[in-house]
Swiss-Prot record:
One BP term from GO: proteolysis
Record's protein name: ATP-dependent Clp protease adapter protein ClpS
Subunit composition and interactions: Binds to the N-terminal domain of the chaperone ClpA.
A Pfam cross-reference name: ClpS
């Protein structure tokens, strides 16, 4: 079976259209960045609440943020990554923390 589609014009001529390959969406890493003011417990809470990490995984990521300056929380399509960044940023500001959450292409 051919992957091309056949179309009939009003004049009964057959036209062939090449099938196009759909590219998978680009993925983006959501990244938490270290600061000197946001408590470690709050970072763990963010990781559990917005990224569904269990306490052990959240603690590992929090320690990586603390010691290495930043860490990836998850990898998502652009729209979901943007939403996660906005949610984390809003939640941090509501709780008066300067936690910086960004996204970068994976």
């Amino acid at each position: 079976m051919s992957k091309n589609f056949e179309w009939v014009t009003p004049d009964s001529d057959l036209l062939e259209r090449e099938s196009t390959k759909v590219q998978p969406p680009k993925l983006y890493n959501v990244v938490l960045n270290n600061d000197d003011y946001t408590p470690m417990d709050f970072v763990i809470e963010v990781l559990e609440r917005f990224f569904s990490h269990d306490i052990d995984k959240a603690t590992q990521i929090m320690l990586k943020v603390h010691y290495e300056g930043k860490a990836v929380c998850g990898t998502y399509s652009a729209e979901i990554a943007e939403t996660k960044v906005a949610q984390v940023t809003m939640y941090a500001r509501e709780n008066e923390h300067p936690l910086l959450c960004t996204m970068e292409q994976a």
